[in-house]
Amino acid sequence: MAQFYSAKRRVTTRQIITVTVNDLDPFGQGVARHQGKALFVSGVLPQEQAEVVLVEDKKQYARAQVKRRLTDSPQRQAPRCPHFGVCGGCQQQHASVALQQQSKRAALARLMKREVDEVIAGVPWGYRRRARLSLNYQPKTQQLQMGFRQANAKAIVDVVQCPVLAPQLEALLPAVRECLSALSALRHLGHVELVQADNGPLMVLRHTAALPAGDREKLERFSQTHGLSLYLAPQSEILEHIHGEAPWYTSDGLRLVFSPRDFIQVNDGVNQQMVRTALEWLDLQPEDRVLDLFCGMGNFTLPLATRAAHVVGVEGVPALVEKGRENAALNGLSNVTFFHENLEEDVTRQAWAKHGFDKVLLDPARAGAPGVMPHIIKLAPRRVVYVSCNPATLARDSETLLQAGYQIQRLAMLDMFPHTGHLESMVLFERRLT
């Protein structure tokens, strides 16, 4: 007769060990050594000793949680945010900005197998001009939760302040919470998005059921009182403009109008420096033809057009192409054209590419641009500037250019998101003369 039984559950004793952290990875985790492999410990800095509990032990690495910190690094600082350590937004407020930049710079250098020439950074606090806050009504407490997701969890951390937000947006948080809590439809609210445009703040409210007329009136009064533009989003694809003027921001002195749904760089200060650096690295001449791939609505494209003979911007999102054309017209630029194309296809076959390009700029998403790199090589531009939000895909794509005879002339780390593990960068490639 068959015997059915439950196997005894294997119990693993959580081992407590004492370690000294000797490095910080780009995500803000301390790195120590244990039994010949890397041990990652959140919350511990280089030169600090701590008692830790092993929570994961793999063949190549292990992870641990801090039980007790025994020493403090001179680079340790008190986090400004009361939610740090619970909120998933920031991972490195306990480390000095200098240490954060040093660890990211070192990580980029390792991946690119080259020293980093410069760090492009702005103010470390109050830099975020965009934030999406989750909303959730709690029937038991009859309170509306408004905040960011908890680290490694779906739970919402109710935020009362956020020091990385632009000061104008952080100041709005209590008033936004009070306004939304007074709505009769507060059980049907999904999230609220706040954006600081150059011409003032805007708010987008995602709601999952129709708002009563009284709620709409309350929201409109709120937007008028606080001088912000208001948009309602009854569905993810629908955006209803209720109050205020269309938002815009500047890039190298040019005005770019955008929709709340459009991608814009979160850190305005670093974006301005990044655009100026790209213009400088490309060494634009009045006769140059320039190609801007993954151009969005013209963050780089339009400034390029003020210095070159002709610029072509290519983008895979039709709405951004239309916005780029609109912004070119608003700025009186007639030497720039925008095209909607599938960037995985051979762009060199397009009619607009038949005259070739002297310089190329690309700013792809995290997946990088593996399908585009061979086409850039076909175009044979003298200089290429690659702006990246993922150093791993940048390193991969760079190999294609290096093997084709290009050389890295400049490498910069962009500290676009201080106190987080995000690492952005930009590289200048120059074709080697034969």
Swiss-Prot record:
It catalyses: uridine(1939) in 23S rRNA + S-adenosyl-L-methionine = 5-methyluridine(1939) in 23S rRNA + S-adenosyl-L-homocysteine + H(+). Coiled coil: none annotated. Catalyzes the formation of 5-methyl-uridine at position 1939 (m5U1939) in 23S rRNA. One of its GO terms (molecular function) is 4 iron, 4 sulfur cluster binding. Pfam families: TRAM, tRNA_U5-meth_tr. Its EC number is 2.1.1.190. Belongs to the class I-like SAM-binding methyltransferase superfamily. RNA M5U methyltransferase family. RlmD subfamily. S-adenosyl-L-methionine binds at residues 265, 294, 299, 315, 342, 363. [4Fe-4S] cluster binds at residues 81, 87, 90, 162. The active site is at 389 (nucleophile). One of its GO terms (biological process) is rRNA base methylation. The keyword 4Fe-4S applies. Keywords: 4Fe-4S, Iron, Iron-sulfur, Metal-binding, Methyltransferase, rRNA processing, S-adenosyl-L-methionine, Transferase. This is 23S rRNA (uracil(1939)-C(5))-methyltransferase RlmD. The gene is rlmD. InterPro entries: 23S_rRNA_MeTrfase_RlmD, MeTrfase_TrmA_AS, MeTrfase_TrmA_CS, NA-bd_OB-fold, SAM-dependent_MTases_sf, TRAM_dom, U5_MeTrfase_fam. It comes from Klebsiella pneumoniae (strain 342). Residues 10-68 form the TRAM domain.
